[in-house]
Amino acid sequence: MKFYYLDGHLPVRILGEELDSFIIEKSNKTLEFVEKNRVSEEPASFGNQLGFIKLPKSFEPKFGEDYFRASEDLTKAIKVTYNDSKYERLRVSFGLCFQTEVEALAYLAALEFAERFKPTN
């Protein structure tokens, strides 16, 4: 299965091609027409991989620095100021901190795709 990256980070699947646009499927199953120049084969930054999906490079914030991560319920990206707590250090060590909101959203989209396409036994 091949994934492409919308706006440099968000994983999508290409379902069709028009003259100047692609028909893409997002992780939430919505279809959209987007200009071809917004879709790339590789993400703008690459850190880890989740199945076939390349995740953005994680960010290691310093004390008092802002970063983005997934909310506790994994429904949205939230902006957080790094406070050096035990939980924040765990997030950093597991690569769950991102410099931009779109990178955090890309991580959430990757989780959503992985859940949809996980192998069934």
Tell me the role of every PLM-derived stretch.
Residues 1-121:
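Structural boundary micro-motifs
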